[in-house]
């Protein structure tokens, strides 16, 4: 059973320069958090949006609700806000973490996030 879905707002399809270089990095922070949570008995799923699409993530959010954790940074702010809106449409509880949301918690809470980890 999945207690928590973790993702981030970076979609390689949206980054023309990175597509030319093609050296994206794995979401090590999300993977580390996932591993730690699993050792404590939580069911965790990681959706790596790097090679995914907004449509795939939206389909996953439509498939069932729960708790969604999203890593935030300045570059992914527009995508994260769209993810928050989509998740809330499908009754997910949204937890945000990372440098962007930690520096602007009020803005992210106003946009629909339930929790911002600082």
What are the residue ranges of the model-derived segments?
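Extreme N-terminal starter segment of soluble prokaryotic enzymes
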Residues: 1-5
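Short beta-strand segments
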Residues: 7-8, 71
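Short polar catalytic/cofactor-binding loops
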Residues: 8-14
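Glycine-rich beta-alpha loop elements in corrinoid/cobalamin-binding modules
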Residues: 29, 36-118
């Amino acid at each position: 059973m999945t207690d928590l879905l973790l993702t981030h707002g970076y979609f390689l399809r949206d980054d023309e320069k990175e597509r030319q270089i093609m050296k994206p990095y794995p979401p090590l922070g999300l993977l580390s958090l996932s591993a730690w949570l699993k050792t404590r008995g939580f069911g965790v799923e990681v959706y790596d949006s790097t090679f995914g699409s907004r449509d795939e993530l939206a389909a996953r959010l439509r498939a069932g609700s729960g708790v969604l954790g999203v890593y935030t940074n300045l570059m992914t702010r527009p995508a994260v806000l769209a993810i928050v809106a989509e998740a809330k449409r499908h009754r997910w509880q949204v937890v945000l973490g990372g440098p962007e949301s930690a520096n602007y918690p009020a803005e992210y809470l106003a946009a629909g996030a339930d929790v911002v980890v600082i």
